[in-house]
Amino acid sequence: MKTFFLKKLTIILYLISSSVSYSIERPEIKNLIIHKDKKKIENIEFTKSEAQKVSLNNFKQNPLIINFWATWCAPCKKEMPSLDRLKALNDFKNFNIIPINIGGDSYEKSKKFFDEFKIENLEIFTGSGPEFSQLFKIRGLPTTILIDRNGFEVGRIVGYIDFNDQSLLDWLLKNL
């Protein structure tokens, strides 16, 4: 009798807790880490195209999405086409989306990757893997840093994400 009562009580508590957790509003976006306190981003230089040096200061005033990737990274191969489609969306035309290859690949190898995966809306950027890894505390690829209009990191995505996920799109528009 006690066992039956305990099983019934467990089921009731489970059902109540499940309904409560669904009623709390929070983003359910896999791999998104939202910072409680915004972090000021330091200016750093990297290379655009084959040889043009640029810095994060070149991209002020608009939301900034920095995606760190490499040609040899399997999740990056899956993620990059959705990042490219994100840049093509009208709501994101004013966003600066910067994919920086920090895998030690040359511009030519990055260009070949972009051609192979039909990446048409993004530019090619390259940077020093160790320097960026240390500055941004990157522990794996892909890693995406989300920076608001004021130059503060408000969150990051660690690992693969589908940039066409509607809940992510809504969060980006609201918070960057």
Describe the predicted segments one by one:
Residues 1-9:
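Bacterial N-terminal signal peptides that target proteins for export
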Residues 8-18:
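Bacterial N-terminal signal peptides
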Residues 21-43:
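N-proximal helix/coil linker or "cap" segments that precede and/or mark the start of modular domains
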Residues 55-77:
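Short active-site neighborhood of thiol/selenol oxidoreductases, capturing the structured segment around
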Residues 65-66, 97, 144:
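Hydrophobic beta-strand anchors of alpha/beta hydrolase catalytic cores
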Residues 78-117, 128-134:
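Structural microenvironment flanking redox-active thiols in thiol-disulfide oxidoreductases
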Residues 116-120, 127-173:
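Thiol/disulfide oxidoreductase modules built on the thioredoxin-like
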